[in-house]
C-alpha cells in the first residue's frame, strides 16, 4: 500500500457557530449530507459537530487534490462512525470517481476538537 493522497484542515468552531447563527439550517445543509443532517438536528452542540464535518470534508478534498471545486462538493463526503465510534469517510459522486482514478483502496480519517478548533486529517491509500 502507498499513500496517494493526504489532506489536513482546521476549522475555528466559533466562526462556524456564527455562520450557523446567521444562515441557520441552510448553512448546515450546504455542508452536511442527508444522513449527517439527521444527526445534526438532534444535537445540542451543532456548531462543534458542523466544524468537525467541515474540516473533514475539506481535508478529504485536499487529499483528492481538488479542494471543494472541479465538480467535487461537500455532499460527496459523508462522515460516519463505526460501532466503536471511530470516524470513517464515505465517498460518493465526483469524489468517488476521482478516488477510483487515483487507485484509492483505503481511506483513513482522524478528527479532533478542542475548545476553539476542530482539525481533521485524511489519508488515501492505494
Curated annotation (Swiss-Prot):
Belongs to the P-Pant transferase superfamily. AcpS family. Transfers the 4'-phosphopantetheine moiety from coenzyme A to a Ser of acyl-carrier-protein. Mg(2+) binds at residues 9, 58. One of its GO terms (molecular function) is holo-[acyl-carrier-protein] synthase activity. GO terms for cellular component: cytosol. This is Holo-[acyl-carrier-protein] synthase. InterPro entries: 4-PPantetheinyl_Trfase_dom (IPR008278), 4-PPantetheinyl_Trfase_dom_sf (IPR037143), ACPS (IPR002582), P-Pant_transferase_sf (IPR050559), Ppantetheine-prot_Trfase_dom (IPR004568). Its EC number is 2.7.8.7. It catalyses: apo-[ACP] + CoA = holo-[ACP] + adenosine 3',5'-bisphosphate + H(+). One of its GO terms (biological process) is fatty acid biosynthetic process. It comes from Vibrio vulnificus (strain CMCP6). The gene is acpS. Coiled coil: none annotated. Keywords: Cytoplasm, Fatty acid biosynthesis, Fatty acid metabolism, Lipid biosynthesis, Lipid metabolism, Magnesium, Metal-binding, Transferase. It is found in: Cytoplasm. It comes from the Bacteria.
